[in-house]
Amino acid sequence: MATAHKIVLHSLHGYRPELDAIVAQWIREQVKYVGVVGVDASRIEDIIDELCIGDGSSPYFMVTAFHDLSESVQDAIFLAEQLSGELAGDVQVVEF
């Protein structure tokens, strides 16, 4: 199953090193947007940004956003659905 170009990452436990491989896969699949909601959402968003930049020799542009604890998964999905133009398309929710 192909990954959607927009992801809402629902963090259940905070950052874990396994996220690095997931983000690498999203880059290969040309995911354009990741919204993070849940535990450590801000930290996870920063880590995703760092992974996209890498060593700077071949950065990948991905729009990221985090949602604080007052926002739900449904709020994150709603925001992702509003994105248009190059960011239009289906939203996939990934629990991590």
Can you describe what each PLM-predicted range is?
Residues 1-96:
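ATP-dependent carboxylate-amine ligase
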